[in-house]
UniProtKB/Swiss-Prot annotation:
Family to which this protein belongs: Belongs to the arthropod phospholipase D family. Class II subfamily.
Keywords of the record: Cytolysis, Dermonecrotic toxin, Disulfide bond, Hemolysis, Lipid degradation, Lipid metabolism, Lyase, Magnesium, Metal-binding, Secreted, Toxin
Cofactor binding note of this UniProt entry: Binds 1 Mg(2+) ion per subunit.
Class of this enzyme: lyase
Active site: H5, H41
Catalysed reaction equations from the record: an N-(acyl)-sphingosylphosphocholine = an N-(acyl)-sphingosyl-1,3-cyclic phosphate + choline; an N-(acyl)-sphingosylphosphoethanolamine = an N-(acyl)-sphingosyl-1,3-cyclic phosphate + ethanolamine; a 1-acyl-sn-glycero-3-phosphocholine = a 1-acyl-sn-glycero-2,3-cyclic phosphate + choline; a 1-acyl-sn-glycero-3-phosphoethanolamine = a 1-acyl-sn-glycero-2,3-cyclic phosphate + ethanolamine
Function: Dermonecrotic toxins cleave the phosphodiester linkage between the phosphate and headgroup of certain phospholipids (sphingolipid and lysolipid substrates), forming an alcohol (often choline) and a cyclic phosphate. This toxin acts on sphingomyelin (SM). It may also act on ceramide phosphoethanolamine (CPE), lysophosphatidylcholine (LPC) and lysophosphatidylethanolamine (LPE), but not on lysophosphatidylserine (LPS), and lysophosphatidylglycerol (LPG). It acts by transphosphatidylation, releasing exclusively cyclic phosphate products as second products.
Disulfide bonding pattern of the chain: C45-C51, C47-C189
Name of this protein: Dermonecrotic toxin LvSicTox-alphaIC1bii
A cellular-component GO term for this protein: extracellular region
Length: 272
């Protein structure tokens, strides 16, 4: 999966898909009442990027629905969306409420209340393990609204670079048994080693691990892309999807990796 990083403005959806992204990451900020408010990152952000692009969350989600509905030219090119949920602005006790409000919002504006809505898979990426009740609030709301089937399209990620064992324990608390992506990374302005990504890959490949897929961020340089592929990740989050495509076409990688398609299930662990 080639994950376009920090896609917060409607025009950027086209821009990143045209460069080769089949997935995008979008930042979601919340108001004081735990409503998703803007798709916005703010400063500081990755080197070489405009940190201030934004939309109202509802407007972005409606545009995303259009892009990921059959009949749209992007439909079979963009099929995974990571919502990077900026919950650090919320009190811990608001996490469940944020999950409820996010679910209601996506149900209405993205899934069109279950009536021919957007088809992309969604990952809820949460920066704080203490906010695991966002997941339970989200799940319960879709069930209460009569749309438990939409949870088939939803996965989870804790993005705080916590110890993998602690992440697994938190999923157990939340009752999550699958649909788990694990991120690891750092801004493109800095370097980060592969110790934790290797631990995440080991969990993914072990019999009793909870992780289904692993992705690394933010990978912009050619050598960093090669090093990341050598770590056997499933996804690369990048500001330059065209560079990822270029490296995947190199002899060393083109037989080992392929770019995911709509038919690939992002919740299935790949077995060699």
């Amino acid at each position: 999966w080639i994950m376009g990083h920090m896609v917060n403005n409607i025009k950027q959806i086209d821009e990143f898909v045209n460069l080769g992204s089949n997935a995008i990451e979008t930042d979601v900020s919340f108001d004081k009442k735990a409503n998703p408010e803007y798709t916005y990152h703010g400063t500081p952000c990755d080197c070489g990027r405009d940190c201030l692009r934004w939309e109202y969350f509802n407007d972005f989600v409606k545009a995303l629905r259009t892009a990921t509905t059959p009949g749209n030219s992007k439909y079979d090119k963009l099929f995974l969306v990571v919502f990077d949920l900026k919950t650090s602005s919320l009190y811990d006790y608001r996490a469940s409420e944020a999950g409820t409000k996010l679910a209601k919002n996506l149900l209405q504006h993205y899934w069109n209340n279950g009536n021919n809505g957007g088809r992309a898979y969604i990952i809820l990426s949460i920066p704080n393990l203490k906010h695991y009740k966002l997941i339970t609030g989200f799940q319960q709301t879709l069930k209460d609204e009569g749309h438990a089937e939409l949870l088939d399209k939803v996965g989870y990620d804790f993005s705080g670079n916590d110890d993998i064992g602690d992440v697994q324990k938190t999923y157990e608390k939340a009752g999550v048994t699958g649909h788990v992506w694990q991120s690891d990374g750092i801004t493109n302005c800095l370097l980060r080693g592969f110790t934790r990504i290797n631990a995440a890959v080991a969990n993914r490949d072990s019999a009793n691990g909870i992780i289904n897929k692993v992705y690394y961020w933010t990978v912009d340089k050619r050598q960093a892309t090669r090093d990341t592929l050598d770590a056997n990740v499933d996804g690369i989050m990048t500001n330059y999807p065209d560079i990822t495509v270029e490296i995947l076409n190199e002899d060393a990688y083109k037989t080992k990796f392929r770019i995911a398609t709509y038919e690939d299930n992002p919740w299935e662990t790949f077995k060699e």
